[in-house]
Amino acid sequence: MATFSTNEFRGGLKIMLDGDPYTIVENEFVKPGKGQAFNRTKVRNLKTGRVLERTFKSGESVEAADVLEMNMQYLYKDEDNWYFMNPETFEQLPAAQAAVADAEKWLLEQDECTVVLWNNNIISVTPPNFVERKIVDTDPGLRGDTSGGGGKPATLETGAVVRVPLFLNIGDTIKVDTRSGEYLGRAKE
């Protein structure tokens, strides 16, 4: 199995700790005036999403996580699982609700998303950074409403609630940043 030395640590590197795959979020090299140098890292568990702080002695080596990140197409959902397809091989893989997590409120059937595979199981799903969705419920816009000031909540076709300008109505298609949940503008039709 491949290993990484602490001097190879950088953000985004996938490593194994305590039998689970983790990704390094932050890495800081610390060289105290007295004593051995070490790396202070923040790591995110790819299965649960929890973030931990760990320290590693300088020169220590850690096993590399055998994870694969790939683009897959979301197909459908049943009672227990979400199903994704590899667009090159047409292989379909199920994902548990825990793996989909917050991506659920942005996904529509046929959407391309980034999926992390570990032991041929989907452990994490990331929606596209920007999506275009139709507004299915919002308060009606009134005369004199402008894009400046305020805003109102709007429910999208996937169930996500986004704060939008007052002039938007039911049926309008908008562009949203899925990382922050922010309204970016009307969709170009």
Curated annotation (Swiss-Prot):
Major location (coarse): cytoplasm
UniProt keyword list: Cytoplasm, Elongation factor, Hydroxylation, Protein biosynthesis
Involved pathway(s): Protein biosynthesis; polypeptide chain elongation
Keyword Protein biosynthesis recorded: yes
Record's keyword annotation contains ATP-binding: no
Function: Involved in peptide bond synthesis. Alleviates ribosome stalling that occurs when 3 or more consecutive Pro residues or the sequence PPG is present in a protein, possibly by augmenting the peptidyl transferase activity of the ribosome. Modification of Lys-34 is required for alleviation.
HAMAP family reported for this sequence: EF_P
This protein's name: Elongation factor P
